[in-house]
Structure formats: structure tokens, C-alpha cells
Amino acid sequence: MSVDSLPNQADPPPEDTKGRRNRHLGLALVLITTAQLMVVLDASIVNIAMPHIQDDLGFSDANITWIITAYTIAFGGLLLLGGRMGDVIGRRKVFMFGVTVFAIASLFAGLAQSEWELLTARALQGLGAAAASPTALALITTNFPAGRPRNRAFAVYAAMSGAGAAIGLILGGSLTEASWRWTMLINVPIGIAVALAAPKLLSESEPQPGRWDLPGAITATLGLVSIVYGFNHKGQVANHDTGALYSWTDFWTLAPIIVGVGLLVAFVVLEKVTPHALLPLRIVTDRTRAVSFLAMLIVPAAMFAMFLYVSLFIQDVLGYGPLKAGFAFLPFSAGIMVSAQIASNLASRVDPRWIAGAGGVLASFGLWGYTNLDLDSSYVTDLLPWIIIQSLGMGLLFVPLTLTAVAGVDQRDSGVGSAVLNTMQQVGGSLGIAVLGTIFANGIADRMAELTSGAAQAGTPPTEEQMALFGLVSQTAGTVDAFNVAMWLLIAGTVITFLGLNIKHEALSADGQVPDGGETDADDESKSVTV
């Protein structure tokens, strides 16, 4: 007999039940996006704090970048394993494990008294992030009904992923004013609160029976770690007198990349014959999903380059302090959140490729604006308009790419599918910093050589003031060169996205249907209980 047929005067009106459910979903979304924001911004929050960390803990110039690298290598290398753990064990369990490890590691990082203590804690933060991030995205599928509620949740998630780096710069500048240690310790109460609230607000996924694919886990993890290490090494300064980066032929750049590619090839071969694969190849063989993954490799490469080089330009050329430089990115965070909401509202009415295409055009136009920077540029007239334009474009890009990457993924695979998306974003960011860092350094070196050669031909050695001016002119030239390449990189990603996405907006509509015909836990909650 159906419970709905039993008289019960205490039953709340349907609108009250709906209101409570909406509030519950709202709190669940706050929990998920808070965890994702915490994970994403931690890659950038230390950027402004690094000089203070260097002075306090005695980092050498050669080792200081490992504060970021230790985190990104562990994060990027373990994402696939973290996503699969969520599918097999339960996404909520792995999510709680991830944020707990992240919080504990943040405490150790904030209390670190030496280089190795901090770097070990940063690697542990990456491990926690690799468990929390893919399961956070997969928990949206588990907890939100398909259609408009899920699209909106994905939009907020995408906005947090895109704006996290900018928010990290703002927080980094603010917290560093007190102490660099607060850039780590701020995560502790947030992580603990998220872990404690998760059982009350998030539904658990159905664990998927199966054995662990240990050979696949080992080859994929080592392959990704090797590639991320190689790209990160390429982006580091080899000669601090000239500012030159390591070359692509440097052993510790080239060898890890080659080894990593070889391990990933072996991983694909293993996954074809393994009954319980870490990454079922059906996830990446779908055309639309593959295009979304590829675009997520390219788009962050351009975005993270903007954060790095605009931040350097604002501080070195415009003379902004850490706090002011951080707040200079506040319009980017606001813009990407606004456009992400617009993209969410359009997702059920407009084909994703048109939304992403418009976003790519806007973001590319924003990057073009940075190519006109010079020593006479100001923030308000020469940076702010392009920051806003690029942020609006990025929001329109991230939402459809996130939606199409997870649309139609079977419930049992949504954790690892989310992990692939996060992996592409993480590796793409490392790739962008490495490739565009080379362009940036070469642009500086070429312009400096040109200026010093001209001074030598004039027969008078440049003064100290002239050399300082030459440095700013050269840095600006390198910045412009890097943004030229970033613009064309993003244009290529936009074209690939527009031509490759092959999914209609009906698949993302608010009709309550999951594209693959599966059901979510959130769908189950809306059904009548029978006895």
C-alpha cells in the first residue's frame, strides 16, 4: 500500500516539502562548491605569499616554486585514482576523506618550520584535493535531479573552478598582510566544517562492486605525475641572473614527459583488456565528451597564463602592492560568476556549442586586449575592460564544457568521468605555464638584448636607472608575446569546441531525464515511498 494513501494530518503541504527540499539542495551545493573552491584556490593563494615564505623558511630561489609544484603534481597525478575510489567505495565517503586529509595537511603546512615540512604538507594537500575534487563534481550528479537544478549546480561548480584562482590571489594578498601561515590555516576550519556537514546534506552514491585495477592505477598515476612534473620543471627558472627557463631538451623536462607518455600508452593498453578498468574507455571514446576533455586541456592553459602575467604586470610595472594586486582580480571573479549563471539559464534552450563558441570569442577578445599593454598603460583603462570581457567569456565556456563532459556518463562511472575532466584542467594549467613561460622568457631576453645592444652602439653604458627601465620594457614585451600565443591557443580551443560538440540542448533540458536513462539518488527522493 502506498504511504501517500494513508491519512496524516501532520503531513506538510506540498509547497513546504518542496521548499525544504530546495533549501536542502541549496545547502548541499554550498558544501560541494566550498570544497571545490578551497581545492582550486589553494594552487594560487600562495603566489603572493611566496616571498614571505621564502624569507621565513629560507627557501632558495631554485626551490621556492616547489611550494606550488608539490601541490599540483600530487593533485594532477592522483585525480583519476581519487575519482575511481569514489565510484567503488562511495563518493561521499571519499569526499569526506579528501577534505579531512586536506584540512589536516593545511594545519601541518601552516605550522611548518622547514622547507621539507612545508613541501610534504603541500603534497598531502594535493592528495586530499585529488580525492575531494572529482567526487565533489560527481556528487552533483548523485544529489541533484537532471535538468534545470543540475544545470544550475554545474554552473555554480564551473564558476567556482574558474574563479577559484582569482579568489586565491585576493585571499592570498589579504591573508599575507597578517602572516603567510594564514594562507594555509584558513583551510582547517573550512575543511572540518565541510567534512562534518557532508553526512547530513549529501546523499551517498551506490558503491560499485569490483576489484581494484592496481596496474592501471599505478601506470596512470605515475604517468600523470611524470608529465605534470616535466611541464612544471619546464616552467621553472634555470638562471636567476638572466631569468631564462629550463629548455625543452633539459633532461628533467624531457625525460619525465617521455616516460609519462609511455606509461599512459601502457595504461590505455591495460584498460582495453582489464575487466574492472580504472578508466573504462567508453568514457573517452564518445565524440562530444572527448572534445570537452580536449577543450578543458586548452582553455585553462590560456586562463592561468592570464593570472600569472597580469599579476606580474600589475605588481612590477604598475607598482601595486600584494593586497591591491589581489583585489585587482575581483572583477574577474564577479564576471565569471555572472556569465556562468547566464550559461546555465541558456543550457536548456541553446545548443552548448553556441554558448561555448560565444564564450570563446569573448575570452579571445579579452586576451587580444592584453597584447596592447605598454609602460603607459593603466589598470582602469587598459586592463579592467579586458579582464571583464575575458571573465564573461570564460564563464560561458566552462559551463557547457562541464555539462557536456558529464552528460550521459553512466552513474557507476561518474566519479572517474569527473576525475578526467579535473585532470585535463590541471594538466592544461601546467602545460600553459610551461609553454607560455618559454614565450615570455624569450620575449624578455630578445627585447633586453636589443635595448642593451642599442646602448652599447651609442658608446655609453646604460645607467642603473636605464637598466631598470630596460627591464620593465622587456618584461612588457614578453607579456605581450605570451598573450599573443595564449590568444591563438584559445581561438584553436574555441574552434575545436564549436566544431566537435555534438549534443543538443534537449539532452540538457529540464525534463528530469538523465541522458543515458539512469536515475539519480535525487530522483529517487521525489518518488512516493511504498510499504
Regions found by a protein language model. Give the residues of each.
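Short, Lys/Arg-enriched, Gly/Pro-containing loop segments at transmembrane-helix junctions
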Residues: 207-211, 242, 276-282, 407, ...
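Hydrophobic transmembrane-helix bundles of small-molecule transporters
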Residues: 176-295, 320, 483, 487, ...
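Hydrophobic residues within the alpha-helical transmembrane core of Major Facilitator Superfamily
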Residues: 37, 73, 107-108, 123, ...
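Transmembrane core module of solute transporters
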Residues: 23-74, 241-416, 528-531
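A gly/Pro-rich, aromatic-decorated transmembrane alpha-helix motif that marks the paired
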Residues: 163-178, 225, 229, 427-447
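Transmembrane-helix exit segments and adjacent C-terminal regions of multi-pass membrane proteins
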Residues: 1-34, 266-269, 276, 288, ...
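Transmembrane-helix bundle of Major Facilitator Superfamily
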Residues: 2-200, 343, 350, 371
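C-terminal module of multi-pass small-molecule transporters
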Residues: 85, 89-99, 113-120, 132-155, ...
